Regions:
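Membrane-interface interhelical linkers
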Residues: 1-21, 25-30, 35-81, 87-97, ...
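Alpha-helical transmembrane segments of compact multi-pass small-molecule transporters, enriched
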Residues: 39-43, 105-119, 196-203, 235, ...
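Structural signature of hydrophobic alpha-helical transmembrane segments
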Residues: 1-12, 65-82, 122-138, 187-199, ...
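Juxtamembrane helix-loop boundary signature in multi-pass membrane transporters
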Residues: 1-11, 108-168, 178, 276-299
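Juxtamembrane helix-start motifs in multi-pass secondary transporters
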Residues: 32-33, 102, 189
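Short amphipathic helix-loop junctions that connect adjacent transmembrane helices
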Residues: 178-182, 240-247
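Hydrophobic/small/kink-forming positions within alpha-helical transmembrane segments
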Residues: 14, 18, 45, 80, ...
């Protein structure tokens, strides 16, 4: 069941990336991110309030948000900072790079998570899982090389560096999620970390963007900004429940979630008219084969 949830989360993440790319086209990055945190928190705020003031309504359901103290909230605040750091780097990078380049670089996260999971949680992979992991790593590497044909110098492009930092902090977030899910309710973590991100973003907007807003790309409203929040919240909700299963493996869940690159690739080809699709499509077939071996290895 947890593997099915991981694949569902991957599909939702692909839509999230596509809506994010559209929202950031010729738009100010920080306001888009700020609105995303607001809409995401508004989605979960009713569940927080109902659980606190009318506890019997959601009691025992997957939408219940347990009432906890500071000793728990401090761990969720840490997650908020980690995730927001990854998002800031990722949003700036995605604005300036093709979606079919960003996807493969983001797909290196499972490699980092795999190493971390083996070191921190003692996870061990069977033969099928190792085959799946190696195929996925190879395919992501080849897909990244295809991007060089578009004239993007990976060594000297600061936006590439931003995406790499987003992948690194995203991997740290994934490992931290596995730690949190061993002891905390998934709905508790997802609800409150979205709320805390709004408060973290307020000073960032006021100090970094607002004073210089007339000197940079102006902000424009786009309805796809709401789509970012909807697909992200749905993807994360499914993801947290996948990790809450006792036998779930963060290294596999993280790898499967990166198959969202397939969905974002389709959007990049059909809606954003990106280049070098033939060579990238061949690489994507390896991604799918790798995901199939991961599926075999978990049964």
């Amino acid at each position: 069941m947890w593997l099915f949830l991981a694949f569902l989360s991957a599909a939702l993440l692909g839509f999230y990336d596509a809506f994010k790319k559209q929202s950031l086209r010729d738009n100010a990055v920080l306001p888009v991110l700020f609105l995303n945190t607001i809409f995401s928190s508004l989605i979960f705020l009713p569940f927080i309030l109902i659980s606190a003031f009318m506890p019997t309504v959601l009691s025992g359901s997957m939408f219940e948000v347990p009432v906890v103290g500071w000793e728990v909230h401090k761990f969720i605040i840490i997650k908020s900072f980690i995730v927001l750091s990854s998002w800031i780097f990722g949003y700036f990078g995605m604005k300036h790079l093709p979606l079919t380049i960003v996807g493969p670089i983001n797909a290196t996260r499972p490699v980092l998570v795999l190493i971390g999971a083996m070191l921190l949680f003692g996870e061990r992979l069977n033969l099928y899982q190792w085959i799946g992991v190696m195929l996925a790593i190879l395919s992501f590497f080849l897909l990244s090389r295809s991007g060089k044909k578009e004239g993007i110098d990976f060594k000297h492009n600061k936006w590439i560096f931003f995406i790499i930092l987003a992948a690194l902090t995203g991997a740290i977030s994934g490992l931290y999620d596995k730690y949190l899910m061993k002891q905390l309710n998934p709905m508790l973590v997802q609800s409150w970390y979205n709320v805390y991100q709004v408060f973290i973003m307020c000073p960032i907007i006021l100090l970094l963007w607002y004073p210089k807003r007339k000197e940079s790309t102006p902000f424009r409203w786009d309805w796809t900004i709401i789509g970012i929040s909807i697909f992200l919240c749905a993807a994360d909700f499914v993801y947290f429940y996948a990790l809450s299963y006792e036998d779930s493996m963060i290294s596999i869940v993280s790898m499967v979630r990166r198959s969202s690159v397939v969905v974002s690739f389709i959007f990049g080809a059909l809606f954003f008219r990106e280049k070098n699709l033939k060579s990238k499509a061949i690489d994507l077939i390896l991604v799918l084969i790798g995901m199939f071996f991961l599926y075999l290895g978990s049964h």
